[in-house]
Each structure stands twice: as C-alpha cells, then as structure tokens.
Amino acid sequence: MFDPSKLSEMLTQFQDKAKEMEEKSHNTSFTAKSGGGLVSVSMSGAGELLDVSIDDSLLEDKESLQILLISAINDVYKSVEENKKSMTLGMLGGMAPFPFGS
C-alpha cells in the first residue's frame, strides 16, 4: 500500500537522480557529420554547441555550406534529444512505482 509519509523521501530520490542525469548530460558530447564528413558538428548533452568543423572546399560555396551545416546541427540535436529521452526513461524506470489502488 502507498505510504504518504514516504513521499518526501521519494521526491528527494527523484531530485538526486535528476541532478545526476543533468551532470552526465553536461559531460557527454555528440557529433554529427554531413556531406560525407565535409561538415562536422559537436554538441554537449545539455544542447551547447561545442565545435564546428568545415572542410576548406566548402568555403567558396555558401549555399552548400548552409545546407550541410543545417543538416549536421539538426542531426546532432536529434541525438542529444534522444539521449535525454532515454536517460529520463531510465531514471523513471529506476524509481519505485506509486502503488495507488493497492
């Protein structure tokens, strides 16, 4: 049966796990490439852009550069979001379930 007196303890555990997840995110980086590696973008798990690498051959072709940058940034952002979702589900899965109605 659900014990309301344990709610505070459960919330503290949840907050601790959320803080741990945030720290892991800041220390994780993701990289995406486009144009066969002509453009490479790295982003932290917190969504901070860390690095952009552009092959010299693209410096004369602004339109191609823009397209490849957008593609790489979108790809790395999707990786970061998928990681956040996965970590959140893992965190919630590790929490004790609320046995309401038991």
Curated annotation (Swiss-Prot):
Homodimer. One of its GO terms (molecular function) is DNA binding. NCBIfam families: DNA_YbaB_EbfC. SUPFAM superfamilies: YbaB-like. Belongs to the YbaB/EbfC family. Binds to DNA and alters its conformation. May be involved in regulation of gene expression, nucleoid organization and DNA protection. The keyword DNA-binding applies. Keywords: Cytoplasm, DNA-binding. PANTHER family: NUCLEOID-ASSOCIATED PROTEIN YBAB. GO terms for cellular component: bacterial nucleoid; cytosol. Its main location: cytoplasm. This is Nucleoid-associated protein WS1681. It is found in: Cytoplasm, Nucleoid. It comes from the Bacteria. Pfam families: YbaB_DNA_bd.
